[in-house]
């Protein structure tokens, strides 16, 4: 009996202690919620989630919470608060909440993108960043690789002159090959079946993640048959089989004196860890084959469909705004001409092109809602208390479409990134984070910026891109997903007359 009384007293003491600890703490305003289902009945079901959450700010403010099942999640839609989470308190908010679907993608939190903060995540992120240093000079210089793939894409399009085609597949293949060179030191021919396989499992995973996932809110639902979960498992299995085959080939030819890819760096780290030739806390457990595959899969997921999607968005907006395309081509003609192909140094002169890229990244961000963060301890955001383990989601769409930060935010206006004279690039608002910020920022930002600029400069130097005859410009609504995708559309490809004339002149002078 006395044991029962003691237990009761301890329970009451803990209750009053916890109440006193949170007494006076201010929580963000919350959506209504019901037992079991939480706020689900009060979240708009039609339209893009990022737009719906942005609209909810009108009632609940730039930071608010909602219940997903029994879990309280905080939504951030203001730059100052987002910067606090991502940068000022980036370490404290660097955690990742466990989600069924993301766990399936990452073999339960391995790799970089979906891994919780900790030693393994830091190691793999550091190695991924180090891989870009392998491509600084010589024939393996990153810019040279990108230019080669951009030129190959242009050569392919020359065979489709005056035709209307969907550019998504050739663009996807070009970007995939760049990532394959970085990851494995391998490039594939356009007709190689492995490219079709990569495209298939990538699209399969993205399409699966685009569905509503009640299993992420109610994990116990996994005991029942679930088509979405089955589809994710199927495509992840194919992905891992492809990457495992490449990993084994890389192991066979591995030479510690010739490190030329991210896979080599990971294999080297694994070898050092296995031989205890590593720092304390960096053991071989962090470099199992599944850890390596998860990291490579993250680079694939973050580096292929994202860049390919943005290129499609840029082309789509140029089809809607042909006067912008003409301004870019005029810049190319005046600053580069046709005797050479563009380089990244030309970015200082092709200001309208760079401004267009920045505007597309604003108006159609790659990830309208960033992957959820999680508080690693009891924290605060602004004046609000955030308990440990609370998921926090940055609504990037809200940052990029705030009328307080942007003039006519829903209007495509590349000139907003230029000064009044059009001679300098500017940042009109700090509320602009296309690649995130802080410890969880996109590790491929430098690569992506080079790819977007060089591919578009190469394309517009040689071709006119127009709406096909008797067709309408592409729909700009897009499909909300982990990556913000545009619906497939066709483009009429026409070799520019100025390019033809320049090539004819070159041929005339050849002996």
UniProtKB/Swiss-Prot annotation:
Reaction(s) catalysed (UniProt annotation): a C21-steroid + reduced [NADPH--hemoprotein reductase] + O2 = a 17alpha-hydroxy-C21-steroid + oxidized [NADPH--hemoprotein reductase] + H2O + H(+); progesterone + reduced [NADPH--hemoprotein reductase] + O2 = 17alpha-hydroxyprogesterone + oxidized [NADPH--hemoprotein reductase] + H2O + H(+); pregnenolone + reduced [NADPH--hemoprotein reductase] + O2 = 17alpha-hydroxypregnenolone + oxidized [NADPH--hemoprotein reductase] + H2O + H(+); 17alpha-hydroxyprogesterone + reduced [NADPH--hemoprotein reductase] + O2 = androst-4-ene-3,17-dione + acetate + oxidized [NADPH--hemoprotein reductase] + H2O + 2 H(+)
Keyword Chaperone carried by entry: no
Biological process (GO), any one: progesterone metabolic process
InterPro entries reported for this sequence: Cyt_P450, Cyt_P450_CS, Cyt_P450_E_grp-I, Cyt_P450_sf
Keyword field: Endoplasmic reticulum, Heme, Iron, Lipid metabolism, Lyase, Membrane, Metal-binding, Microsome, Monooxygenase, Oxidoreductase, Steroidogenesis
Highest rank taxon of the organism: Eukaryota
Enzyme class: oxidoreductase
Main subcellular localisation: endoplasmic reticulum
SUPFAM superfamilies attached to this UniProt entry: Cytochrome P450
Activity regulation text: Regulated predominantly by intracellular cAMP levels. The 17,20-lyase activity is stimulated by cytochrome b5, which acts as an allosteric effector increasing the Vmax of the lyase activity.
Binding site residues for heme: 442
Entry EC no(s): 1.14.14.19, 1.14.14.32
Entry's Gene Ontology cellular component terms: endoplasmic reticulum membrane
Subcellular localization(s) per the UniProt record: Endoplasmic reticulum membrane; Microsome membrane
Cofactor: heme
Annotated Gene3D superfamilies: Cytochrome P450
PROSITE patterns recorded: CYTOCHROME_P450
Pfam families listed in its UniProt record: p450
One Gene Ontology term of the molecular function aspect: steroid 17-alpha-monooxygenase activity
Pathway note: Steroid hormone biosynthesis; Steroid biosynthesis; glucocorticoid biosynthesis
Record has Lipid metabolism as a keyword: yes
Function in brief: A cytochrome P450 monooxygenase involved in corticoid and androgen biosynthesis. Catalyzes 17-alpha hydroxylation of C21 steroids, which is common for both pathways. A second oxidative step, required only for androgen synthesis, involves an acyl-carbon cleavage. The 17-alpha hydroxy intermediates, as part of adrenal glucocorticoids biosynthesis pathway, are precursors of cortisol.
Assigned protein family: Belongs to the cytochrome P450 family.
Name of the protein this chain belongs to: Steroid 17-alpha-hydroxylase/17,20 lyase
Lineage: Eukaryota, Metazoa, Chordata, Craniata, Vertebrata
Annotated gene: CYP17A1
């Amino acid at each position: 009996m006395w044991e029962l009384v003691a237990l009761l007293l301890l329970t009451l003491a803990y209750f009053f202690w916890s109440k006193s600890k949170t007494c006076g703490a201010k929580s963000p305003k919350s959506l209504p919620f019901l037992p079991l289902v939480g706020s689900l009945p009060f979240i708009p079901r039609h339209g893009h989630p990022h737009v719906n959450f942005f609209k909810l700010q009108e009632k609940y403010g730039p930071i608010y919470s909602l219940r997903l099942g029994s879990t309280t999640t905080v939504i951030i839609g203001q730059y100052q608060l987002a910067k606090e989470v991502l940068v000022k308190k980036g370490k404290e908010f660097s955690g990742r909440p466990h989600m069924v679907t993301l766990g399936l993608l990452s073999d339960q939190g391995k790799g970089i993108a979906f891994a919780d903060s900790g030693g393994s995540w830091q190691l793999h992120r550091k190695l991924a960043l180090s891989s870009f240093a392998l491509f600084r000079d010589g024939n393996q210089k990153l810019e040279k690789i990108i230019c080669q793939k951009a030129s190959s894409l242009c050569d392919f399009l020359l065979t489709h002159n005056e035709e209307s085609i969907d550019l998504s597949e050739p663009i996807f293949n070009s970007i995939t090959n760049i990532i394959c060179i970085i990851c494995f030191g391998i490039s594939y021919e356009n007709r190689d079946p492995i490219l079709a396989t990569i495209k298939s499992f990538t699209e399969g995973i993205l399409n699966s993640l685009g569905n509503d996932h009640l299993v992420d809110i109610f994990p116990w639902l996994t005991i029942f048959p679930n088509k979405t979960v089955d589809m994710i498992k199927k495509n992840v299995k194919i992905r891992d089989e492809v990457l495992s085959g490449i990993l084994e080939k890389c192991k066979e030819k591995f030479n510690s004196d010739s490190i030329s890819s991210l896979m080599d760096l990971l294999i080297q780290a694994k070898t050092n860890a296995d031989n205890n030739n590593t720092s304390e806390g960096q053991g071989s457990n962090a470099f199992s084959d599944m850890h390596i595959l998860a990291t490579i899969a993250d680079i694939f997921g973050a580096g292929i469909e994202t860049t390919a999607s943005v290129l499609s968005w840029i082309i789509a907006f140029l089809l809607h705004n042909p006067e912008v395309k003409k301004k870019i081509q005029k810049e190319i003609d005046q600053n580069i001409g046709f005797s050479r192909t563009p380089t990244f140094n030309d970015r200082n002169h092709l200001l309208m092109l760079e401004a267009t890229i920045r505007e597309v990244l604003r108006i159609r961000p790659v990830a309208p809602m960033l992957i959820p963060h999680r508080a690693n301890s009891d924290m605060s955001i602004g004046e609000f208390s955030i308990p440990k383990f609370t998921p926090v989601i940055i609504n990037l769409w809200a940052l990029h479409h705030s009328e307080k930060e942007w003039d006519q935010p829903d209007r495509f206006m590349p000139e907003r990134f230029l000064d009044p004279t059009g001679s300098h690039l500017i940042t009109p608002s700090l509320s602009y984070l296309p690649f995130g910020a802080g410890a969880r920022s996109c590790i491929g930002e430098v690569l992506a910026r080079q790819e977007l600029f060089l591919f578009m400069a190469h394309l517009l130097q040689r071709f006119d891109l127009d709406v096909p005859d008797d067709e309408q410009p592409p729909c700009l609504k897009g499909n909300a997903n982990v990556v913000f995708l545009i619906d497939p559309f066709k483009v009429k490809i026409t070799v520019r007359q100025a390019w033809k004339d320049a090539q004819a002149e070159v041929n005339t002078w050849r002996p």
